[in-house]
Amino acid sequence: NGLCAHNFYCYMNNQLLEYKKMIDLRDLFHGLQNQMLASLNVNREFIEHPGSKGDATEQHWIEFLRTYLPDRYKVDKAIVIDSTGNVSEQMDVVIYDAIYTPFIFKQDGFMYIPAESVYAVFEVKQDVKGYIEYAAQKVESVRTLKRTSIGMVASGKTAAARPLTKIIGGILTTTSSYSGNDTVKVQLRKLKGLQTLDLGCLCDTGSFYVDYNETEPEG
């Protein structure tokens, strides 16, 4: 069907000054979602080995995020490490700072990323069913790490240390085999403290974002 376009007209004294077609951004993003879903479904249907299927799905999410996030953010599969040597579980998707990330270790696809550089972490699964709590536990393994922040000198002036912000945690899946949203909401309500999930994308079903200042998870 292609993208829908809206016509834009501008008149003055019955004279047409400007005419152009405007792309419907909602249709554009819906097209990107369908493209993503088609690729994930190909992996799901035709890659039979569970480990290989998981690796392919994780890499597809990583490449998608690399394409559409600003250049200052990097995306990789990695283990997060803190200054005391403690490490997280291996995270399927880590979004981290591309500019201020010091070199720790990267070899043959294996990476350690310092906790101070991490903005968000995600667990990737084929189906959300049965994995909300599992994803929450992996997110917790990152949030429990020690993070430090120090001041810096810029233009001859000392700037105060930047406050540490919450590391976003979530889950990315191809589908949901639950009959509705209620089960996911119940599971999200049970998560407390460092295990809370902030958002999730269930590619063929929808997405959720949780504002913990509210009493009801939105989805």
How would you label these PLM feature ranges?
Residues 8-11:
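Aromatic (phenylalanine/tyrosine) cluster motif
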Residues 4-6, 16-90, 95-219:
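Intrinsically disordered, low-complexity Ser/Thr/Pro/Gly-rich regulatory segments
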